[in-house]
From Swiss-Prot:
This is LIM domain-binding protein 1. It comes from Mus musculus. It comes from the Eukaryota. GO terms for biological process: anterior/posterior axis specification; cell adhesion; cellular component assembly; cerebellar Purkinje cell differentiation; cerebellum development; epithelial structure maintenance; gastrulation with mouth forming second; hair follicle development. GO terms for cellular component: beta-catenin-TCF complex; cell leading edge; chromatin; nucleoplasm; nucleus; protein-containing complex; RNA polymerase II transcription regulator complex; transcription regulator complex.
Amino acid sequence: MSVGCACPGCSSKSFKLYSPKEPPNGNAFPPFHPGTMLDRDVGPTPMYPPTYLEPGIGRHTPYGNQTDYRIFELNKRLQNWTEECDNLWWDAFTTEFFEDDAMLTITFCLEDGPKRYTIGRTLIPRYFRSIFEGGATELYYVLKHPKEAFHSNFVSLDCDQGSMVTQHGKPMFTQVCVEGRLYLEFMFDDMMRIKTWHFSIRQHRELIPRSILAMHAQDPQMLDQLSKNITRCGLSNSTLNYLRLCVILEPMQELMSRHKTYSLSPRDCLKTCLFQKWQRMVAPPAEPARQQPSKRRKRKMSGGSTMSSGGGNTNNSNSKKKSPASTFALSSQVPDVMVVGEPTLMGGEFGDEDERLITRLENTQFDAANGIDDEDSFNNSPALGANSPWNSKPPSSQESKSENPTSQASQ
């Protein structure tokens, strides 16, 4: 179906709606060139439908909507399938579109309850092959209104209206449409391979041409056979059986890989894997990271101040008794640097860079405790003059008593 384009600056007469079997503009879809960006100033503008418009100004990405185009390439590669395709063909298909550590998840609901199957990269080729082994002759995916999001190292494609369409030729021509949500994660690199594939199936429909019903309208037995579904929740019995088998095969991938790598017997591989798993279970838990001790800075005392303080203490000890408090240096009782931690915030503490250092400064040349009883050294200070009031000594207690009666008698 063709639709006219009413854009004022668009030179195209019409464009085709997106089809999973052909690119948006037929053969005019630009080839996949990783590392390039469409530019308005370079050549004619490609003919894109509204969902394939070139990237907007300021979008720093090395490609346009390459996620949709990768799905188109996947559908195109699946169309090349023939009955002669072997395991190597399917492995090459998976290598082209899936990462080495890719995970594929299928969720659906059967009569006995919901099911969820997750398989790794090794089992993905056989999954797609089981779809064709179940009678399908064609397989492709249709994405309607997908949402693309950019992350740090991958690009996610979320399509709530995704469909997986298969066509079966036996026992009668039937088209099966499986509807659900398809979520994909593409690695943000040149290869744009899928890392996560999650398909949640909601419902399915099986379509039969009217011409076939008209041919067997008079055959009740044939009509009864046509009324029965050939799939369960859109999946053939071959695919369902393989997914059930993957429940056992997926945990055994470690054994198979060890058997191929070291050429060990299955029993030895099992013993080795169990022993390593036991070691991981009994291994002591990692000790919590200890907090580093607070950094303290020691003040370096100059040589002159040390000598002067030492000399002063020697002279004072020879001339008089010291008080008990003066026998211990103040610096030996209180550390030079005290670290004050910040208050906790939301259950954690700040780091060392947020700690504040409080330094106590001392004058080592002056000892207040020793100067209390040293009156002679204070009075003989050259800073005091001869007539200074500080030079006169206070009267003794006996002199004060003798002066008191005289003063009273005179009164």
